[in-house]
Amino acid sequence: MSWALLFNSLALALPVALATVTVGWLAALFIASSRGGAQLLALGGVIVSLALPPFLVVNVWLGLLGNVGVLKPWLPFDIYSHGGVVWVLTLMLWPLPCLMSLGALKRLTAEMLDAEPGLCGWPLVRSLLLPMTLPAVLQSGLIVFALAFNNIAVPAILQVKVFPAQFWVQFSTSYNFELTWQYGWAMAALPLALLFLLRGRAFAWPWESQGVQAEVLRNRLGQALLNLVSVAVCLFVALSVLLPLGHLLLDTRSWTDL
């Protein structure tokens, strides 16, 4: 077994988990403090982003930042790299922490806010919102870590050597089942450990509670924090949903190959 590839996969999954829980938490805060059309659009973007196939997301960024990408002359970022895989996986997986953090935020009540009427903005986040959502953040981070570690499609397309992709290539070319038992334990160990850690733990889902009214939460967050979460949501919905769908709909091959 290649320990170097195994550690490379672990080093890939960690930044993906950290990035997705950060973006997902900010997006959850935006949804919890929004109402009407803005809330529905954000939720729709979260769900669509989670449902998009990996090859569609990767193809968009290959067209933009690949060897002959449109933006390559102006943005010399190597998409065929460790950082490129982290970026694409972050765009694919941030909805999971968003939905789980939103469920935790939905448990916020007016009584909790009234207990500390002077808490607003960042002090409110630090003293109340982060502690009450921390279990959901940790749970979602572990799930994303396992998904990123075992992802095969994105690293394989971007030609980044990681343990699952290398294992799949070797097995698919030789159909060596002894190799499966010898190396496959590393891929199975992480999800099994995750199931063990999360056994018996309750997940807070967004539809289980109504939560505090959006107007009340918005007033307590303050304009600066609202602007930050709004920019984060708009940016990631645009990059992870509108960009892939726009590429799919505007590409003439999408219609000629039907």
Predicted regions and their residues:
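Flexible interhelical linker loops that connect adjacent transmembrane helices
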Residues: 201-232
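Solenoid-repeat scaffolds in large eukaryotic assemblies
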Residues: 116, 179-180
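Short amphipathic alpha-helical coupling elements at transmembrane boundaries
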Residues: 43, 66, 110-118, 127, ...
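Short helix-to-coil transition segments within interhelical loops
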Residues: 106-133, 160
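Peri-membrane helix termini and adjoining interfacial loops of integral membrane proteins
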Residues: 63-74, 158-164, 205-213
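Glycine-rich helix-loop "coupling/hinge" segments at transmembrane-helix boundaries
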Residues: 149-175
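Membrane-water interface segments at the C-terminal ends of transmembrane alpha-helices
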Residues: 1-106, 132-156, 180-199, 223-253, ...
